[in-house]
Amino acid sequence: HITLQLIHKTPKDTKMITEKLEKAINYQFNRELFSEYYYLSMASYFNAEGLSGFENFFLVQVEEERFHAMKMYRFLNEKGGRVTLDAIEAPKTEFKSPMEVFQLAFEHEKLVSGLINDLMDLAI
């Protein structure tokens, strides 16, 4: 027999984050979720190609992106913000070669790093 106990948390009266920063963190949160999806697509490609080492590399990236997203989720909630979930666009699923996958992953990482830098600039 399992007993479920619900704990009601009182809504925060004071938001400890600006609307602009909340919106920017939510945007980045959703980019991290897309990145997770994108790298999962890349892992799937390598699985289909029989390249399990490369597949595993991208599965590790999948977990890392989820970890980043969840840090933002917790931060927004701790600061009285509200997490918004946007639709996740379908990532590219067909690749010409392993080299193309790594080139795309590198370009994507540069993009996401730039977004993080912009977020830091906004926060300070």
What positions do the PLM features span?
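Iron-associated oxidoreductase/ferritin-like identity signal
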Residues: 1-124
